[in-house]
Amino acid sequence: SKQAHITASKLMDYNVDYALINRKMFDVKSKGRLKVEQYLSSSMEYYLDDRCAMITITQEIIDKSGMEAAEFEGIASLTLQVEGVEVGVTVKQREENVYKISMRSSNYVDVSALCQKFGGGGHIKAAGCQINGTLDEVKKKLVNAANQAIEEAK
């Protein structure tokens, strides 16, 4: 936001190592986080002529990673790092047959409206919801909804 940039510029008047802060916030990741990102990147699924990318984080993946659940925050943006992807979907298991969905849009698709169909919401380019069902059922619902949203946005 505008205010965040104003505040950041004021901090530069003090002897703050903003380059170090930036590096620690955006560039440095734990080995566990990098391993998880590597695994998720290699297992990413593509739908709708590669316009939709989906990663799935099961409880098994969380357990094997040794990471805390909070360390998975921000992983949703991984799906938008692929050229041509318009809708990125992260499906994270909360418990058996309960999934937290995070969606990101790279361009014109309103993922907030998409998530509202499942009782969620958010912003045009970042939104979320929760869907109950088997993993296959959840993925099918998401791909169908993403397809509709992409077609409507054209």
Model segments located where?
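Hydrophobic helix-and-loop "lid/oligomerization" segment in the mid-to-C-terminal part
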Residues: 1-117, 122-154
